[in-house]
Amino acid sequence: MAKSNNVYVVNGEEKVSTLAEVAKVLGVSRVSKKDVEEGKYDVVVEEAAVSLADTEEVVEEVVTEEEDILEGVEVVEDEEEEEAAEDVEEPTSEEDSEDEWEEGYPVATEVEEDEDEEIEYPEVGDFEDEKAIKKYIKGLTDEQLQAWCELEGAEWVENEHRNINRMRMAMAIKAVHFPELAKKPSSKKKSKYAEYTTEELVEMAIDNNVEVRDDKGNERILRMYTIIALREAGLIS
């Protein structure tokens, strides 16, 4: 039976009915309506009545081919939050907070070395454990951390948000020095709709006069809504 209240589809697959449940699924302390509207998280609001039973299978299949796009939007998992909590120390005053801290990360207030002087970065085997490398990373600027990653050949997916990008660089360089700590890639089931591009699905809907819900400019949401509409019209199985 369809529900009349809003349903939040989190990460394209898990459906919950409240923002508190959305935050719990994402592993963050709080998610506001504004966060959802601005697209800060991968959350889709089902505004109209939609049969959850009909949608569940589609969302589950569609999300498998889209998950690579979301790499690291598992960026604030419990493990990373705990690490951030350990690493960040509160500044001693409001003035210190403005001058020496930026979005939870310490920034250098004085240039202790010549900017042109090349840093001699540690090599693999120089750190005793993960705690030691984490302490070393804390003392690097974003530019120095990036240079170290590039020097070591560490790979990460860049993100426009500074904190997320820094976290990914830190995880990438730690994986080089401690490969046993790196997360193993999970095997993913290929969606049976992978053979269709989003454009082909949309064209199929247009050719058959199938109405597709407003995607609000998000291509992944457009793809999901188009597949749902085509399934309901009996054009794909």
Swiss-Prot record:
UniProt-annotated stretches for the region Disordered: 73-105
Compositional bias per record (Acidic residues), positions renumbered to this chain: 73-103
Protein name: E3 protein
Membrane spanning residue stretches: none
Native species: Bacillus phage SP01
Coiled coil stretches, renumbered: none
Function in brief: Hypothesized to function in the shutoff of host biosyntheses. But it seems dispensable both for host shutoff and for phage multiplication. Its shutoff function is probably not entirely specific to host activities.
